[in-house]
Amino acid sequence: MKRTFILMMDSFGIGAAADADKFGDVGANTLGHIAKACAAGDIEGRSALNLPNLNKLGLGHAGELASGYFPAGLKKDIEVVGAYGFAQELSSGKDTPSGHWEIAGVPVLFEWGYFKDHHNSFPQELLDAIVEKAGLSGYLGNCHASGTQVLDDLGEEHMSTGKPILYTSADSVFQIACHEETYGLEKLYELCHIVRELLEPYNIGRVIARPFVGSGKGNFKRTGNRHDYSVLPPAPTVLDYMKEAGGQVVSIGKIADIYANKGITKQVKGTGLTELWDRTLEEVKAAGDNTIVFTNFVDFDSSYGHRRDVKGYADALEYFDSRLPELFEILQDGDVVVLTADHGCDPTWGGTDHTREYIPVLFFGKPVKAGSVGRRETFADIGQSIAAYHGLPKLEYGTSFL
């Protein structure tokens, strides 16, 4: 029985990519800088980063290969039981869909559309069309913003006026924040559908529904009912090939949204690291032959990376690491586990955006030969390796190392 489990540690980069200069990210290193800050005692309430399970899978060695130095605080003299390496991104952006699609064998070689102006970010003709088609009385925002700060700035006005908060970032996104109770969740989703259709000429990767609750400034909180409305991947992914072959592809968290539901046979919701881990272990136990279980652990990115919260990121990594033995205990002989990321989001870096970084490539399980797989020239090597293992059609991009 062959099964593959992909654990996507969203934003967990391990060193500035070779083309980081094109993105203003030379020197970024999500893993390296978190480890350095913890080991140096720079973070109140933190000691050295302790990731024994990830480290024995080769994380520290992968980090050294990618950046030239071993992550501070991790033990180097250990037996590595998995295959480890790092991968450069072919895709033109450092965004979520590009990273995920390339990992599944389909790099994004075109340029996404972006709303680059920090104020009055959206074209007036687009805003007018949204107001007319959705029957809005107006809108708030129309700017680049942090998802939490924009709630403090505009949440109360949104509640009193009923006008949705529209904002964007350096990514190819159009985000809409509305209060779940005063505006309504389904109404927010309907608005996102309308905006998704109107954005077609602009080549924007995602519309993101950002529902929140709370009574006023300082206590607004985003909920787990986020929904991403992505464009379709431009070619079949390894997930599509698995589904077409009669296998199962289980999405946990926001995976289905990122692939616009293509290649997915089952969707499982989960919010927060604890619930995502719980759901993952449940689906691993239930998985049959020729199954891919794919979980996105979004909190690394959304809760800690973008918010530049080094302590929170470090604590989350240690929690993630602490759950790995539960997975080890239930693996079967034909199982392959993949741990990777889709981009970086260095919490020590300036700004609030993603960072262009190498990603870790960690494979383990009885079918996997332990040792270095070195530098991979595309994230698609991951998808190609999964396709080869399951006897699926060869992908256009990527080289298998299994």
Curated annotation (Swiss-Prot):
Belongs to the phosphopentomutase family. One of its GO terms (molecular function) is magnesium ion binding. It catalyses: 2-deoxy-alpha-D-ribose 1-phosphate = 2-deoxy-D-ribose 5-phosphate; alpha-D-ribose 1-phosphate = D-ribose 5-phosphate. It is found in: Cytoplasm. This is Phosphopentomutase. Keywords: Cytoplasm, Isomerase, Manganese, Metal-binding. Gene3D superfamilies: Alkaline Phosphatase, subunit A, Phosphopentomutase.
